[in-house]
Amino acid sequence: MALNLSQKQEVVAELADIAAKAHSLIAAEYAGTTVSQMTAMRKQARETGVFLKVVKNTLAARAVEGTDFAVAADKLVGPLLYAFSMEEPGAAGRLIKEFAKSNDKLQAKVVSIGGELFPAGHVDVLASLPTRDQALAMLARVLSEPAAMFARAVKAVGDKQGGGDEAAAPVAETAEA
């Protein structure tokens, strides 16, 4: 279906708004993917905060101008599916990687994050990035570890010097009346 000029401008404006807010971009070849596979991928994309869109490459190139993904504009060739991670940088990578396992026709061609363009093989690296909750848990562990080490050291010194709890037992006094 051919788009008129105003429709093309709407598509570019929508995609430019998404690209400005997105954390990462993966452009993947999807030729040969069935409708049911694409529907399942779109459903999971909505659940994981990934914006999926199939648009003409010239419109996509115009939309990413002035964003971190402008470095990918020259690589947008062929029929491509655009996956923008809106909530977590690795969400699009996990989505594409998961669906590529069951569909060999789906292949990442462009991977971009933070104004950098990476080879298509880096989709695995992007997919392995921790989620926000995982990153916060790792940070909490890193921050709590020094305190735990100090507590273990104090306990070890206490055990070595007098047996720990036994040294703190009160001595009974006899009362004279």
Curated annotation (Swiss-Prot):
Provide the GO MF annotations for this entry.
large ribosomal subunit rRNA binding
Taxonomy, superkingdom: Bacteria
* GO CC aspect terms: ribonucleoprotein complex; ribosome
Sorted alphabetically, which keywords does the UniProt record give?
A: Ribonucleoprotein, Ribosomal protein, RNA-binding, rRNA-binding
Its GO biological process annotations read: translation
Q: Name one Pfam family in it.
A: Ribosomal_L10
Cleavable signal peptide = none
Which NCBIfam families would you find in this protein's record? PRK00099.1-1 (NF000955)
Family per record: Belongs to the universal ribosomal protein uL10 family.
Reported function: Forms part of the ribosomal stalk, playing a central role in the interaction of the ribosome with GTP-bound translation factors.
Q: Describe the subunit structure.
A: Part of the ribosomal stalk of the 50S ribosomal subunit. The N-terminus interacts with L11 and the large rRNA to form the base of the stalk. The C-terminus forms an elongated spine to which L12 dimers bind in a sequential fashion forming a multimeric L10(L12)X complex.
Q: What is this protein called?
A: Large ribosomal subunit protein uL10
Q: Which organism is it from?
A: Xanthomonas euvesicatoria pv. vesicatoria (strain 85-10) (Xanthomonas campestris pv. vesicatoria)
Q: Which gene encodes it?
A: rplJ
